[in-house]
Every structure is written in C-alpha cells, then in structure tokens.
C-alpha cells in the first residue's frame, strides 16, 4: 500500500505548470480515434485513466504512437473503422472512460464488454444505460453496474433531459448520437463541463447549443486535428488550497484551463477570502487558459451556493479542507453526487476531518464544517486520488505529522503530484507498507 507521510510547517512557493487536463485528454483520444486522418496531441495527461482509454482504442485497431512526454499521434480509424476487440476493455478506475466508451460502443456493429477495478464496479452506470437503451442500444449490466456487456445496434436520435447534471452522461449520449439516425439532443439541469461540445466542433461535427441544450445530427465525419491540452484545474486545485492555507505561500501555476464550466473552485475560494489572480489570459485549443497566482489568505466560512456545485464537483475534497481551515462554518448542500465518485466523498472527507479533530456534521447532500485547528494523525483516503491529495495539503497546517493511507490511485489523474508538491515546498515522503 502506498502511503504519504507529510510533515507540517512549510509553505508553497514557485512557478510551474500542472499536467494536462484529464477530461480533455480522454476526449482528445476518443475523437482522434474516431476521426479520419492524423490527430496530434500535445500536453496529454499520461495518467492511468487516460492510458486506459488509449489501450481500449488500440484493442479496437486504432494505431497510435506514444504517449511520450505528453505527445500522442493518433491515426484515426474514422467513425466506421473500429474493429471488434477480442478481450474485455479494461477502464481501470476511470468512470469517464467507461461512460464515454459506452456511448461510442453502443452504435458499433460488434459486441464488446467494459470492465473496471473494484471501485469502478461499484459506481452507478444506470444513468448512461437509460438514455443509451432509449436510443436502441442493447446493454446488459447487473444492478446497473459494470461490467457492461454491449451488443451494438442501429441507434436513433433522442431528446433527453438529464435527471442529474453530469458531463459524462451528456458526453456519452452525444457520442452515441454520432452513430444515430436523426438528431440527438441533451438538456442538462445545471451547467457542466462542455469540453465534448467544444471539441466535437473542433473536429468538424456541428453542435447546436442553446443554453442548457446541445444537439447534433448523426451521419457526419470527424477530421483529425492538432490539439494542445491545457493544464488541469482539478489538479491545480490542490495547490490553490495549499498556498491559500499555508502562511507565507506565493505560488503561480502556469497554463491552467479556466473553462467557465470548471472554475467553481476559484469562485468558491475567492468568496471565502482567497487571494487568487488570473494573468496571461489566452486561448489554447479552443479552451480559455491562464496563469494562476495564489497567495496565503485567511479564509471565512460561507454557504456554498448550490449552483456552483456542478462547476466544482471534482474539487470538493480540496474545499472540505479549505472549510476546515476557515473561520466559522461552511455549509455544503446540493452535492449528493459526491457520494458516487471514486469513494463516498462526503463520508470519507467527513471521517478524515473528524480523525484530525475537526467538527463535521454530515448530511445526505453535503456537510456543515466548523473551522478549527487540525491535529496530526492517520487518515485513510479509501483509494480516492483526490482525497489523498487534499489531505496531503491539509498537513501544511496540521499540528503534527500526518500519514495518509492508500494513495496509489493518485497515479490515475496526477502521477507527478508527489514530485511537484515537494518542488513547491510540501514536506512529503512517499512510502510503501
């Protein structure tokens, strides 16, 4: 078992980029594989999740060179060029890979099976099964969970209203729509990341967007592109947290994607009193990008507006720590989606904070966190990469050393986290049990 041993009392400083965006990296691989011609990707995240997506398409006959230092060359097979895999496609720990691949595979003229690790096989897949089946897909899954046994069939377009805001479900339906007769539309109840819509248009697939509604027509074609993946704001979030809570910190993160559907972490921390400045604003690969400077600032507890929850859904482990370090109470509501992530993030974060001496009232859709001094001690991340990184940053202000258990899955999204954290000043040691 991989453990993090972290000593308190340091600060974060320096200037460096964070790795490529995981969500965009997945989509670059998928659309590059389905496009005609060559797609060149720079800045690709080489984490285990994205590597699982690459391996899946290689199993379906797509030729790729790399990845090597963030560069991947994809020789696209075209929308109709995938070949039947001879083995199950292993998505590892990646819900994004499984849900988006299900959308692609639903319309293929061959059977396929999607599997994952023990954590992924506990996550709900009914949310993609329902719309894909409504489009004509034949998918077998026990209790709405992986493994997914998909028998490709001709699909027809649907007009689908998402019951829960989910970019993964939206993307799965739109990808299936590429293979469907007629128009496929998705309406979301709250804004979610729009990387799929942006990238589909970049690859030549028209997407009509009207407020919460996105529509496309099947029967088109995608054309290979040259793509630059911006830095991942979800990875940057841990450094935004650390520099905000550790006195004397002054840190600049270069080339971070600031897509407005992903910047909830910045808005929430700013509402709490964080000193965050965006500089060198520019556009990279159709996505807004900036350098982010963050300095220490005392935080004040707030009631987080529910409308911001989908815009920061992956960053809540960091926000739980920020709340514990703030003066007063922070109230989180409308965040029940956190219970079906890589772990039950509400329960695991609440339990971890209590182990460090914090006062947390857990609720079905969130929590009330009272700011207090954090003790040292042992915290179990339950194999959740984002929880492991959040508690590593909490150690900056703990009153004693911290040991964080079960950290190996950090490699799924941020394999260079320990090295970058050490470079920035975190007194972190990686150990094996």
UniProtKB/Swiss-Prot annotation:
It holds the Pfam family EPSP_synthase. It comes from the Bacteria. Phosphoenolpyruvate binds at residues 22, 95, 123, 168, 345, 386. GO terms for molecular function: 3-phosphoshikimate 1-carboxyvinyltransferase activity. GO terms for biological process: amino acid biosynthetic process; aromatic amino acid family biosynthetic process; chorismate biosynthetic process. Its EC number is 2.5.1.19. The active site is at residue 314. 3-phosphoshikimate binds at residues 22-23, 27, 166, 168, 314, 341. One of its GO terms (cellular component) is cytoplasm. The keyword Transferase applies. Keywords: Amino-acid biosynthesis, Aromatic amino acid biosynthesis, Cytoplasm, Transferase. Its main location: cytoplasm. Coiled coil: none annotated. Transmembrane segments: none annotated. Pathway: Metabolic intermediate biosynthesis; chorismate biosynthesis; chorismate from D-erythrose 4-phosphate and phosphoenolpyruvate: step 6/7. It catalyses: 3-phosphoshikimate + phosphoenolpyruvate = 5-O-(1-carboxyvinyl)-3-phosphoshikimate + phosphate. It is found in: Cytoplasm. Catalyzes the transfer of the enolpyruvyl moiety of phosphoenolpyruvate (PEP) to the 5-hydroxyl of shikimate-3-phosphate (S3P) to produce enolpyruvyl shikimate-3-phosphate and inorganic phosphate. Belongs to the EPSP synthase family. Monomer. HAMAP family: EPSP_synth (MF_00210). This is 3-phosphoshikimate 1-carboxyvinyltransferase. It comes from Acidithiobacillus ferrooxidans (strain ATCC 23270 / DSM 14882 / CIP 104768 / NCIMB 8455).
